[in-house]
Regions:
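Active-site bordering "gate/hinge" segments
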Residues: 1-372
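C-terminal hydrophobic structural anchor segments
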Residues: 372-378
Length: 378
């Protein structure tokens, strides 16, 4: 007998789980992506300069990553190096996406499960696995949305608009960020930082309690970990691809243009999402992969959380439920790093360089919240 969980809620996109059961025993379980996007075919023979505008429509949640990856791929093909001001603003754009995404994942998608409710908006009335008062839970929900909103505002500030940003262009950005606007955004993030830390401390507490109740942190089968990094500190703007072995004692680093030499993509019969492997081995991406790869977050509060995480779970850590704690570390990092950038002048210097389009091949790599994203254009 096949049992379906459909539709899945609190995820990006559309999917279901098919479970094959015989006499009460689970024989197999398949995660099935049910929606064909097809953008690889839609954009064939389209003008190259449309890619940064069209490809963000692939995903409303990660539109920023597609926007920046598309621009980087064209710049690679045209042999363009954007100016320093543009790189700072693009990094801010990626940090805004990280902040907004991780706040959504932690507080809207998974915190309700840890408290035994179906929605963050029901924390105060229905939570059954907490000793907090109704008023305290109401404040948790309100503050969670406040932190998420800071990420939304940061994307708008750096990208021109929140959904489908437009500010990154081939050669740079359309303009800097005025000093007053940067100061207001910095003040909002400075106010959000202690709130984010307080919320993450609470999330950590209820996650530990969940692990103790379950007696496990979920599947802890070893895997390789894939991330786009620069050195050993976070860089969501992307530089090279880095694969850490399951034991943590070996690694491979390679540029985006060589990804087919190392990574293998295989289609599946039961899903529109395929499987990617590294030289025949299972790989994981996303937050836990990045935390396993990094030895230093580069900012003080995030570093304290990273140290706590490594002391508690080791490095590399494999348990599946640890992805969420890793997201919390990145949430704090995104706020701290954005504050640093917003403390610098962002309205001085050239926002873009002139260029002439040319035939060629380009690769654009960024580290999206869900893992490395590569745009490859010819």
């Amino acid at each position: 007998m096949t049992r379906l969980i459909f539709p899945l809620s609190r995820i990006e996109g559309h999917a279901r789980v098919a479970i094959e059961v015989q006499e009460g025993e689970v024989l197999s379980a398949e995660f099935q992506a049910t929606e064909l996007r097809g953008f690889e075919y839609l954009v064939q023979d389209a003008p190259a300069d449309q890619m940064p505008v069209v490809t963000p429509r692939i995903c409303g949640v990660c539109s920023t990553a597609h926007h920046v990856a598309a621009v980087k791929a064209l710049e690679d093909a045209y042999e363009i190096t954007p100016p320093p001001l543009a790189l700072k603003i693009r990094e801010l754009l990626m940090l805004g996406q990280l902040l907004q995404n991780q706040a959504t994942s932690l507080f809207i998608f998974t915190m309700p499960d840890r408290l035994g409710v179906s929605s963050i908006f029901q924390l105060a009335s229905d939570a059954v696995t907490t000793d907090k008062s109704e008023q305290q839970l109401t404040e948790v929900a309100t503050r969670a949305l406040q932190v998420r909103q800071a990420g939304t505002h940061l994307i708008s500030t750096a990208g021109g608009q929140f959904i489908h940003p437009v500010k990154a262009v081939v050669g740079g950005v359309t303009g800097g960020i005025p000093a007053q606007q940067a100061a207001e955004m910095r003040a909002e993030l400075e106010a959000a930082l202690p709130i984010a830390c307080e919320l993450f401390d609470y999330y950590w507490e209820i996650s530990i309690a969940l692990g103790e109740r379950l007696g496990t942190w979920g599947d802890d089968a070893p895997a390789c970990y894939l991330s786009a990094i620069a050195g050993r500190q976070p860089n969501f703007y992307g530089n090279q691809l880095y694969v850490l072995s399951s034991s943590g004692d070996a690694c491979s680093m390679f540029p985006a243009r060589d990804f087919r030499k190392y990574l293998t993509y295989e289609a599946t019969e039961y899903s529109y999402a395929g499987h990617t492997s590294f030289q025949g081995e299972v790989i994981r991406a996303n937050s836990l992969a990045r935390i396993n790869v990094l030895h230093d977050m580069g900012t003080p509060c995030a570093n304290r959380y990273l140290k706590r995480f490594n002391e508690a779970f080791g490095q590399p850590a494999h348990a599946i439920l640890l992805f969420d704690l890793a997201r919390g570390i990145e949430l704090v990092y995104a706020i701290e790093r954005a504050i640093e950038i917003l403390s610098e002048p962002l309205d001085e210097g050239d926002p873009a360089v002139p260029y002439t389009p040319q035939d060629g091949e380009g690769f654009g790599l960024v580290e999206a919240p869900r893992g490395p994203l590569i745009h490859h254009y010819t």
